Amino acid sequence: MLKRDMNIADYDPELYAAIQEETLRQEEHIELIASENYTSPRVMQAQGSQLTNKYAEGYPGKRYYGGCEYVDKAEALAIDRACQLFGCEYANVQPHSGSQANSAVYMALLNPGDTVLGMSLAHGGHLTHGSPVNFSGKHYNVIPYGIDEAGQINYDEMEALALEHKPKMIIGGFSAYSQIVDWKRMREIADKVGAYLFVDMAHVAGLIAAGVYPSPVPFAHVVTTTTHKTLAGPRGGLILSNAGEEMYKKLNSAVFPGGQGGPLMHVIAAKAVAFKEAMEPEFKEYQARVVKNAKAMVAQFQERGYKIVSNSTENHLFLVDLIDKNITGKEADAALGAANITVNKNSVPNDPRSPFVTSGIRVGTPAITRRGFTEQDAKDLANWMCDVLDNINDQGVIEATKQKVLAICQRLPVYA
């Protein structure tokens, strides 16, 4: 018999210590990695529920195991809420991650060797959009597109490449692009060559749910997203579509049995909670503040003489180009990390340095906004970061900045 008062602290002190250290790190560090966020205790409660015990291969009402009548209810809630949140007819809430959701789309719509048009990783795309080290680049003929000198997606280049190479699928979406994407133009290009338009909106799903960033759902044949990042739910994936029953059957089959076995029912329940939270008025207010905080930080970096890729941001993230400062992204990442400010090194367009070193950093505001940062707090933070970057080898400046970080983290805890 299992006792409900069993706990990790008593049984596994080594693991418990690591968990406590990570908990403290999250409270005492400012999180600026654009793909990270803090999920709610309600989401974590669902993930720690007894739904973790249930195997449920198949879909609601069509399972391969018995005893699924209650997990069916949980999955149906998640599906209905996802459809309501994003305005679509179809949702598959079973993908374990965004990458697995993307893999399912490839499997559903393409054959190995088919031609795909995807955003270059070096210009802001994602590994699963055709990087040669990823399955997408290994199994498909990928033609990359990028951004122009002004830092905007080059739609004319995209159209020319589409007309030349006749891709079967065009991929929209990004991991490091700060501007508004013209989904309508992308669909027009796809239609000209008879291609599917597949959009990976993982980074901006929360902004889209709140109506502060344009939705690709009315234009794309298929849309995928993660359920964490700006959406602030559990780590997982989601597929959406309005393209009709034939498409829905292909997508369902590609997820199960094509790429996965049993779904993670405790995570699906957590997705249902997160989707409900995303329909609340305060979530919409939060997402609007995310963008305002990003814009405030950009303005402060520019005032301090730092170059911002695309010269602005219209979402939750931006890239700081450090080439002119003769600082590597790796150095900036390490120095800011020593001041308890977490960012990630990131390649910038036409970066002369390797992806392991880079010439830029990516900055995102979902997490700081979640813990209550105002626009003034965001400006102050950008100034502190510039202080560190201007004095990258000065331990005194780094330590003084760390003390400021600890003070604001104490004032604005993640979990009060």
Curated annotation (Swiss-Prot):
Keywords: Amino-acid biosynthesis, Cytoplasm, One-carbon metabolism, Pyridoxal phosphate, Transferase. It catalyses: (6R)-5,10-methylene-5,6,7,8-tetrahydrofolate + glycine + H2O = (6S)-5,6,7,8-tetrahydrofolate + L-serine. InterPro entries: PyrdxlP-dep_Trfase, PyrdxlP-dep_Trfase_major, PyrdxlP-dep_Trfase_small, Ser_HO-MeTrfase, Ser_HO-MeTrfase-like, Ser_HO-MeTrfase_PLP_BS, SHMT-like_dom. Its cofactor is pyridoxal 5'-phosphate. Gene3D superfamilies: Aspartate Aminotransferase, domain 1, Type I PLP-dependent aspartate aminotransferase-like (Major domain). Pathway: One-carbon metabolism; tetrahydrofolate interconversion; Amino-acid biosynthesis; glycine biosynthesis; glycine from L-serine: step 1/1. Its main location: cytoplasm. It holds the Pfam family SHMT. (6S)-5,6,7,8-tetrahydrofolate binds at L121, G125, H126, L127, E245, S354, P355, F356. One of its GO terms (biological process) is glycine biosynthetic process from serine. The record marks H228 as: Plays an important role in substrate specificity. Its EC number is 2.1.2.1. PROSITE patterns: SHMT. GO terms for molecular function: glycine hydroxymethyltransferase activity; pyridoxal phosphate binding. PANTHER family: SERINE HYDROXYMETHYLTRANSFERASE. Homodimer. Belongs to the SHMT family. NCBIfam families: PRK00011.1. This is Serine hydroxymethyltransferase 1. It comes from Vibrio cholerae serotype O1 (strain ATCC 39315 / El Tor Inaba N16961).
